[in-house]
UniProtKB/Swiss-Prot annotation:
<dbReference type="GO" id="GO:0006413">
    <property type="term" value="P:translational initiation"/>
</dbReference>
<protein>
    <recommendedName>
        <fullName>Eukaryotic translation initiation factor 3 subunit L</fullName>
    </recommendedName>
</protein>
<keyword id="KW-0963">Cytoplasm</keyword>
<dbReference type="GO" id="GO:0001732">
    <property type="term" value="P:formation of cytoplasmic translation initiation complex"/>
</dbReference>
<keyword id="KW-0396">Initiation factor</keyword>
<keyword id="KW-0648">Protein biosynthesis</keyword>
<dbReference type="GO" id="GO:0033290">
    <property type="term" value="C:eukaryotic 48S preinitiation complex"/>
</dbReference>
<comment type="similarity">
    <text>Belongs to the eIF-3 subunit L family.</text>
</comment>
<dbReference type="GO" id="GO:0005852">
    <property type="term" value="C:eukaryotic translation initiation factor 3 complex"/>
</dbReference>
<dbReference type="InterPro" id="IPR019382">
    <property type="entry name" value="eIF3l"/>
</dbReference>
<comment type="subunit">
    <text>Component of the eukaryotic translation initiation factor 3 (eIF-3) complex.</text>
</comment>
<dbReference type="InterPro" id="IPR000717">
    <property type="entry name" value="PCI_dom"/>
</dbReference>
<dbReference type="GO" id="GO:0016282">
    <property type="term" value="C:eukaryotic 43S preinitiation complex"/>
</dbReference>
<feature type="domain" description="PCI">
    <location>
        <begin position="257"/>
        <end position="451"/>
    </location>
</feature>
<comment type="function">
    <text>Component of the eukaryotic translation initiation factor 3 (eIF-3) complex, which is involved in protein synthesis of a specialized repertoire of mRNAs and, together with other initiation factors, stimulates binding of mRNA and methionyl-tRNAi to the 40S ribosome. The eIF-3 complex specifically targets and initiates translation of a subset of mRNAs involved in cell proliferation.</text>
</comment>
<dbReference type="Pfam" id="PF10255">
    <property type="entry name" value="Paf67"/>
</dbReference>
<dbReference type="GO" id="GO:0003743">
    <property type="term" value="F:translation initiation factor activity"/>
</dbReference>
Length: 475
């Protein structure tokens, strides 16, 4: 799980050529990297409140502490009970709890650890059910179907958001209005405001783990992905947000947007890694490698020019594999599968498994992998077909079918599907689900009966920008 202790100011708005803002971002990070941890909560003066405050402080601190992956089942159950008790106290007390959280980092760590334990428990429970060998654990899990249940976790996150009125506050800020005017009694307290804010990022993550990628992106409607966003002050939250947004875009076949998200955070990490503590950088290195695998997949579907830093690293990590992905064909299938398995989130099922019929329990990862591989197989011959179409301005359908050794009608169906897939929504502004429909390919065609009309629209490389960028790096 992510356990970063230092944060950086967020990056630029998503402009592909904004190198100046990226440099400013790196400089801002250097200034803030000296953060040494959380400050102690101020003690309440009233002696009658001292014991209660000490108890709350210990519970707040414990909620942010990571649980060992190999912890026994009893410990996982106890951790769930502790979270339920803490969130019940925060949400259902008579009025808002009058405590200041130690820092932004604490609020993120609590939500992050809460979701990590939920994810870990669901994966563990599904694995025990599919194996069907440990009768003692099966009986314990069967008797507690609601422990770390999907409904309970979502209820906590939505309740924190609703209590804090954080969506209303963010909407007011986007309208340049005073957020405190709509915050209410709870939202005016930083404890609720920060927990509510990071619960939105948590919902993005949970909905993505459940496979609802549209709803995952919808949860961020009121959060602007720019350097002023609160999540950008916490490195772990910054990284997590862009990973799950990018992955959701990829699964929705919006590859240009996915590449933009992955590129943004990869450039940010490459420019700040020398200023991060070793433990922090080690903790994000795995996710960093996962993003390179995902961007390799996206570039295979949507060839595009990448930042030189990313392009070089991608060639070093996946040189031969990347070439096979871009060539397509049957030999690319195992590489797509390997990269997806290594880079995807640890998907979970929204319902408890069937302990009585282990063979009926489907691994959520295998389910989403099969959906992804169907898309890969649909586009498998796209590079080969394009290589023929580029040689002509008009071409007979039967002639192309002869080259490819397929039936003409089967080829016609594939061409129509591929043309439809080439029309992608590209994000420009407002919500992450919004955008304008663009042609994602540099090759377009239209069919008139059996005659294929082909047009090629290449975007010339901006040589001036390339020279200026490389001259600046040289001198």
């Amino acid at each position: 799980m992510s356990a970063f202790q230092n944060g950086g100011i967020a990056s630029r708005a998503l402009d592909d050529d904004s190198d100046i803002e990226e440099e400013a971002l790196a400089n801002d990070y250097k200034e803030q990297v000296q953060y040494e941890g959380m400050e102690e909560l101020e003690q309440v003066n009233s002696m009658s409140m001292a014991q209660q405050t000490d108890d709350i402080q210990s519970r707040l601190a414990a909620a942010a502490q990571p649980l060992d992956f190999s912890a026994p089942l009893e410990v996982k159950f106890a951790s769930y009970d502790n979270y339920c008790s803490l969130f019940h106290f925060i949400l259902n007390s008579d009025g808002p709890v009058d405590l200041e959280p130690p820092s932004y980092y604490w609020a993120w760590d609590v939500i992050d650890e809460f979701i990590y334990q939920f994810n870990s428990f669901c994966s563990y429970r599904n694995r025990v059910a599919r194996q069907g060998t440990n009768e003692e654990e099966i009986q314990i899990l069967r008797e507690a179907p609601n422990t770390w249940g999907c409904y309970s976790v979502l209820n906590v996150l939505y309740s924190l958001i609703q209590r804090s009125q954080i969506n209303e506050q963010l909407a007011a800020m986007r309208r340049n209005e005073e957020p405190m005017a709509v915050a209410g009694d709870y939202g005016s307290k930083s404890l609720y405001r920060m927990l509510g804010y990071f619960s939105i990022i948590g919902l993005l993550r949970v909905h993505c783990l459940l496979g609802d990628f549209s709803l995952a992106l919808k949860t961020l409607d009121d959060i602007e992905l720019n350097k002023k966003a609160m999540f950008a002050r916490v490195m772990a939250a910054h990284f997590t947000t862009y990973y799950y947004v990018g992955f959701s875009y990829m699964m929705m076949r919006r590859y240009a947007d996915a590449i933009r998200m992955f590129s943004h955070i990869l450039i940010y990490v490459s420019r700040t890694k020398n200023f991060q503590k070793n433990a922090q950088y080690d903790s994000i290195s795995k996710k960093n490698d996962q993003m390179y695998a995902l961007i390799a997949i996206c570039v295979a579907f949507h060839p595009t020019r990448l930042d030189d830093t990313i392009h070089t690293a991608l060639r070093e990590k996946y040189g031969d594999q990347l070439l096979k992905l871009q060539r397509g064909g049957p030999e690319s299938l195992p590489i797509f599968e390997e990269l997806f398995r290594s880079a995807c989130p640890k998907f979970i099922s929204p319902t408890p498994p069937d302990f009585d019929n282990p063979e009926l329990n489907v691994d959520p990862l295998e389910h989403h992998l099969s959906i992804f591989m169907d898309e890969v197989k649909t586009n498998m011959w796209s590079p080969t077909v394009k290589s023929y179409l580029r040689l002509y301005t008009t071409m007979d359908l039967k002639k192309l079918a002869g080259f490819l050794e397929v039936e003409p009608e089967k080829l016609r169906g594939w061409l129509l599907v591929n043309k439809q897939r080439s029309r992608q929504i590209r994000w420009t502004d407002n919500g992450l689900l919004d955008g304008e429909v663009v042609n994602s390919n540099d090759l377009d065609y239209a069919m008139q009966g059996d005659l294929i009309h082909i047009s090629e629209a290449k975007v010339g490389r901006k040589l001036v920008d390339w020279y200026l960028r490389n001259l600046a790096r040289t001198y």
